């Protein structure tokens, strides 16, 4: 699995066990990702931060 880094088109190959791509962004600024990368479990959203997770190549 390959996930985008913070600035596409750059990407990295995920290590074993991290089989989700994720994008983290502030609720107030959904078009500006704060973090991107590989993760093993999608974190829960909070009042300020949201996560978008997916399990296909470079979908974040």
UniProtKB/Swiss-Prot annotation:
<dbReference type="InterPro" id="IPR045860">
    <property type="entry name" value="Snake_toxin-like_sf"/>
</dbReference>
<keyword id="KW-1053">Target membrane</keyword>
<dbReference type="InterPro" id="IPR018354">
    <property type="entry name" value="Snake_toxin_con_site"/>
</dbReference>
<dbReference type="GO" id="GO:0005576">
    <property type="term" value="C:extracellular region"/>
</dbReference>
<keyword id="KW-0123">Cardiotoxin</keyword>
<keyword id="KW-0800">Toxin</keyword>
<keyword id="KW-0472">Membrane</keyword>
<dbReference type="InterPro" id="IPR003572">
    <property type="entry name" value="Cytotoxin_Cobra"/>
</dbReference>
<keyword id="KW-0964">Secreted</keyword>
<feature type="disulfide bond">
    <location>
        <begin position="42"/>
        <end position="53"/>
    </location>
</feature>
<dbReference type="InterPro" id="IPR054131">
    <property type="entry name" value="Toxin_cobra-type"/>
</dbReference>
<comment type="similarity">
    <text>Belongs to the three-finger toxin family. Short-chain subfamily. Type IA cytotoxin sub-subfamily.</text>
</comment>
<keyword id="KW-1015">Disulfide bond</keyword>
<feature type="disulfide bond">
    <location>
        <begin position="3"/>
        <end position="21"/>
    </location>
</feature>
<dbReference type="GO" id="GO:0031640">
    <property type="term" value="P:killing of cells of another organism"/>
</dbReference>
<dbReference type="GO" id="GO:0016020">
    <property type="term" value="C:membrane"/>
</dbReference>
<dbReference type="GO" id="GO:0090729">
    <property type="term" value="F:toxin activity"/>
</dbReference>
<comment type="function">
    <text>Shows cytolytic activity on many different cells by forming pore in lipid membranes. In vivo, increases heart rate or kills the animal by cardiac arrest. In addition, it binds to heparin with high affinity, interacts with Kv channel-interacting protein 1 (KCNIP1) in a calcium-independent manner, and binds to integrin alpha-V/beta-3 (ITGAV/ITGB3) with moderate affinity.</text>
</comment>
<keyword id="KW-1052">Target cell membrane</keyword>
<comment type="subunit">
    <text>Monomer in solution; Homodimer and oligomer in the presence of negatively charged lipids forming a pore with a size ranging between 20 and 30 Angstroms.</text>
</comment>
<feature type="disulfide bond">
    <location>
        <begin position="14"/>
        <end position="38"/>
    </location>
</feature>
<dbReference type="InterPro" id="IPR003571">
    <property type="entry name" value="Snake_3FTx"/>
</dbReference>
<protein>
    <recommendedName>
        <fullName>Cytotoxin 7</fullName>
    </recommendedName>
</protein>
<feature type="disulfide bond">
    <location>
        <begin position="54"/>
        <end position="59"/>
    </location>
</feature>
<keyword id="KW-0204">Cytolysis</keyword>
<dbReference type="GO" id="GO:0044218">
    <property type="term" value="C:other organism cell membrane"/>
</dbReference>
<dbReference type="Pfam" id="PF21947">
    <property type="entry name" value="Toxin_cobra-type"/>
</dbReference>
């Amino acid at each position: 699995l390959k996930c985008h880094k913070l600035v596409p088109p750059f990407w990295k190959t995920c290590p074993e066990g991290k089989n989700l791509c994720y994008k983290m962004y502030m609720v107030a600024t959904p078009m500006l990702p704060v973090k991107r990368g590989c993760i093993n479990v999608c974190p829960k959203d909070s009042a300020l931060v949201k996560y978008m997770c997916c399990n296909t190549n470079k979908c974040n």
